[in-house]
C-alpha cells in the first residue's frame, strides 16, 4: 500500500526564500514535514532564523484549520509546542500551510502564532534530527 502524500504549502516570503511553494510528501506530522523540507531544500531552517531577525512569525494550519494548543501554555516554549497539535502524528493529515505573519500585525488574539526558532527547536526536541 502506498503512503498518502500530504500537501505542504509555504506562503509569502518563505516560499520565495525556499524557491518552491508546494511540497507533496509522505509525512504524518508538522515536525516531520519541516524536517523533510529542510533536508531537501537546505534552506528552510536558515530562512526561519533570518525571518526571526525580521520579526516574522508563522501561522500554521493543519487540514485548513489553525492548530490546537493548550492556551494556558506559552506557545513559544518547548512545553507549549509539545502540548500543541504541532507535536501530534495525524492519521488523516491532508495539508499543512505555513503562513508568515509580521509581528505586531495583531493576529495573536485571533490565530495561534509561533516563531520559526521555536519550530526548529521543536523538531530537535522531538528527536527528529
Regions flagged by a language model, labelled:
Residues 105-109:
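Juxtamembrane/start-of-transmembrane alpha-helix segments at the extracytoplasmic/lumenal side
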Residues 1-104:
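Terminal export/targeting leaders at protein ends
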Residues 110-129:
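Membrane-active amphipathic alpha-helices enriched in small hydrophobic residues
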